[in-house]
Each structure stands twice: as C-alpha cells, then as structure tokens.
Regions:
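Helix N-cap/capping motif at the beta->alpha junctions
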Residues: 31-40, 61
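Short amphipathic alpha-helix used as the core "switch/output" element in two-component signaling
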Residues: 40, 62-75
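Active-site residues of response regulator receiver
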Residues: 9, 53
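Active-site beta3 strand of CheY-like receiver
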Residues: 45-51
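Alpha4 helix (beta4-alpha4-beta5 surface) of REC/receiver domains from two-component response regulators
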Residues: 63, 86-107, 113, 117-120
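Charged docking surfaces used in two-component/phosphorelay signaling
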Residues: 16-24
Length: 124
C-alpha cells in the first residue's frame, strides 16, 4: 500500500508540482490550501507525512503545525516545511522551542532530489 502524503500549500502551481512529483514516485497524495483545511484533511486522510508551506491565508502553516504536534493521534507524523522565505526557518525554530522540530526544511523553489530524499528518509 502506498504511503500517504498531505500537501499543504496555497499556491496552485506548487500543489500541482508536489502532487505530480510525489505520485510519480509511488506516493498517494491529498491537498489542502491552508491550515484550516489541512487539519480537517489530516483526520480524514491520515497521512504518513505532511509537506507544509508557512505563509498561507486563513490559518498559517505555523498555527497548523502547533495544532498537529499537540494532537496525540498525529503528533508523530513527519512534517517537511517547504518555504520560499529562508528567514522563516530561523523564525520558526525560535518560536517553537518547546515543540518537536519539523523533520526537514526545504527552500522553494523545491529541488526534486532533495525533497524525495527527505521523504524517503522520513517514511520510505
């Protein structure tokens, strides 16, 4: 059975790119456009991994991440943060000192090999 990945990004082109890349490599995907939708999808789709943009309308990636790691059912789901804003890696780390760190940070534009390597490290 294919491992499941939830792609959370407000940019349609980024979502499509990630979905095609991941599905072409044997993963099952679902998408969410913001943190609100992502939390709902997590409970329905039960992903093995989440790729997460930080800057999104409605609920940000940071707020979604806080909710995810506090949810006992999904706290151990690896999260790969994909952001085009480099400084958010440091800001994110500083503002979440008491929380588990995301599995990885990947800068946009996303390098296919780097992302696939991190996904395989996280879930096989």
């Amino acid at each position: 059975m294919a491992k499941k990945i939830l792609v959370v990004d407000d940019e349609p082109d980024a979502r499509k790119y990630l979905v095609v890349l991941l599905e072409d490599n044997g993963y099952e995907t679902d998408v969410a456009v913001d943190g609100d939708e992502a939390m709902s999808k997590v409970h329905k789709f039960k992903p093995d991994l989440v790729t997460l943009d930080i800057i999104m309308p409605n609920e940000t990636g940071q707020k979604f991440y806080r909710e995810l790691v506090k949810d006992t059912e999904f706290a151990k789901v690896p999260v790969i943060i994909c952001s085009g804003v480099t400084r958010y890696k440091e800001l994110f780390a500083r503002s979440h000192k008491t929380m588990p760190k995301p599995f990885a940070f990947i800068e946009k534009p996303i390098d296919q090999e780097e992302l696939l390597k991190k996904v395989k490290e996280a879930i096989g």
